[in-house]
A protein has these predicted regions:
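Structured alpha/beta reader/binder surfaces that contact nucleic acids or chromatin modification marks
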Residues: 1-128
Length: 128
């Protein structure tokens, strides 16, 4: 489950953003047990709900902020400040889908969204 700002979610859905920038990288599936791609649920900030999902095809680690900016829609200066002297991880965004009906966090056993992201168990009735 990934917390994401509304403007970034819209750019992912529009195909304009193919890297989602984070300070840490996911493993394929919880505890590395599932193969890639990794299913990522998108909690959109301010909505109180999961609005959709995308496939994370893998990730890149880089401190070349111009490269990351070109694929993430985030200005290089902002990325450099966010990185704090370290490399960042670009989660490679694959196929994205917006749900017809948003899913409240409570459906996933959560009372609040993660600060950045976290692994969760998906209820059986939510799996495709």
């Amino acid at each position: 489950l990934l917390s994401i700002k509304p403007e970034w979610w819209e750019k992912i859905l529009a195909g304009e953003k193919d890297l989602e920038i984070r300070k840490t990288a996911p493993r394929a599936g919880a505890r590395g047990t599932e193969p890639w791609p990794l299913l990522v649920l998108a909690y959109v900030s301010g909505t109180g709900a999961v609005l959709g999902q995308f496939l994370c095809m893998g990730w890149v680690k880089s401190n070349c902020f111009r490269y990351l900016a070109s694929r993430s829609c985030v200005p290089a200066e902002d990325l450099e400040k966010y990185a704090g002297g370290k490399s960042l991880y670009g989660w490679i965004v694959g196929e994205a889908e917006e749900y017809e009906t948003p899913s409240p966090l409570a459906e996933f056993g959560l009372t609040r969204p993660p600060m950045s992201w976290q692994y969760i168990e998906i209820p059986d009735d939510k799996e495709e």
